[in-house]
Swiss-Prot record:
EC number: 7.3.2.5
Name recorded for this polypeptide: Molybdenum import ATP-binding protein ModC
Originating species: Haemophilus influenzae (strain ATCC 51907 / DSM 11121 / KW20 / Rd)
Keyword field: ATP-binding, Cell inner membrane, Cell membrane, Membrane, Molybdenum, Nucleotide-binding, Translocase, Transport
InterPro entries registered for this protein in UniProt: AAA+_ATPase, ABC_transporter-like_ATP-bd, ABC_transporter-like_CS, Mo/tungstate-bd_C_term_dom, ModC_ABC_ATP-bd, Molybdenum_import_ModC, Mop_domain, P-loop_NTPase
Main localization category: membrane
Sequence ranges assigned to domain Mop in this UniProt record: 289-351
Length: 351
């Protein structure tokens, strides 16, 4: 576990954080530019020192200002991946990967190289690599130092869209297979949803919220980030069963199920999905003989009048699902808070 309880004055920015990060999974550090995201992970790495407080990793004290104890960066067992790859141009990929290697067997080396899909690059030099390939090598080099935690500072920000998509696939795999915590700095909603288990929401140096991604996403505090064009709901649900003939998977939603296209997940394993309000309609009676597979019972808990539509939040088995309808439909059907309804979900995005 990573424990952070620090204060740091950085010019006009007063950074303050008090969080505990589990010993596995991806924790996103999310916020506007200048909110203190990179400064927070630099405090963990030792590149900057706090004014007050302490940071502990797996019962090791990295820094404690009260006792004036501070481990040098190179002794903290931390892997750091920057926005730019920072590879050594005069070393091959293999040479870059082996630089700083500690307590890593050949089998472990081969595993990391295979995990990141860079086996075919080992004899090449950085100058011949694409941006995405360079970042994969940089990640591999960080992992091969045998770190207790991996820090990633917007590793996709300098890449074009095709390279971002390419690297994202490897990051998704990496996040599921390595058994150390990852602190991942980003201001991308897509990266947040696809990669992170938890999110630290930062604003002007202060931690405004810290919880699982789906809880933060669905909370009012995150509303400004999603914009006003459309509501959305993020759910993390366990696999109930698979239906191979139709290539579909059912997720448990209380006593009901949510059908999605088939995913390679075991029964009981959680899958994160996003449902956009434009893909949801509401009926007063359960529809019969419809092509829509996802029809769920729920109760209206919130109604928001927008310029050109009405947004309704329906509580389904403890989960809030948003639907957007026309003002005409609202005037005709007169939906009200507390009313029992059925939601029809036309599409579900698997994150």
């Amino acid at each position: 576990m990573l424990q952070i309880n620090v204060k740091k004055q950085l010019g006009q920015l007063a950074l303050q954080a008090n969080i505990q990060v589990p010993d596995q999974g991806v924790t996103a550090i999310f916020g506007l530019s200048g909110s203190g995201k990179t400064s927070l992970i630099n405090l963990v790495s030792g590149l900057i020192q706090p004014d007050e407080g302490f940071i502990c990793l797996n019962d090791r004290t990295l820094v404690d200002m009260e006792s004036q104890e501070s481990l040098p960066t190179h002794l903290r067992k931390i892997g750091y991946v920057f926005q730019d790859a920072r590879l050594f141009p005069h070393y091959t990929v293999k040479g870059n990967l082996r630089y700083g290697m500690k307590n890593v067997s050949q089998d472990d080396f081969n595993y990391i190289v295979d995990l990141l899909g860079i086996t075919h690059l080992l004899k090449r030099y950085p100058l011949t690599l694409s941006g995405g390939e360079k970042q994969r090598v940089a990640i591999g080099r960080a992992l091969l130092t045998d770190p207790d935690i991996l820090l990633m500072d917007e590793p996709l920000s300098a890449l074009d869209v095709p390279r971002k998509r390419e690297l994202m696939q490897y990051l998704e795999r990496l996040s599921k297979e390595i058994n150390i915590p990852i602190l991942y700095v980003t201001h991308s909603l897509d990266e947040l949803l696809r990669l992170a288990d938890r999110v630290v929401l930062m604003e002007n140096g202060i931690v405004k919220a810290y919880d699982r991604v789906e809880k933060i996403w669905n909370s009012p505090i995150f509303a400004p980030w999603k914009g006003e064009s459309e509501q959305s709901s993020v759910l993390a649900l366990p696999v109930h069963l698979h239906n191979p003939p139709y290539k579909m998977t059912a997720l448990s939603l209380g006593e009901q199920v949510l059908w999605i296209h088939q995913v390679p997940a075991n029964v009981g394993e959680r899958v994160r999905v996003c449902i956009y309000s434009s893909d949801v309609s509401i009926t007063l009676q359960k529809p019969e003989q419809t092509s829509i597979r996802n029809i769920l019972r729920g109760k209206i808990t919130q109604i928001e009048i927008q310029d050109s539509r009405v947004d309704l939040a329906v509580l389904v088995e403890g989960h809030k699902i948003w639907a957007s309808i026309s003002k005409w439909a609202q005037n005709e059907l007169r939906f009200a808070i507390g009313q029992d309804v059925y939601v029809q979900i036309k599409a579900v995005s698997v994150m």
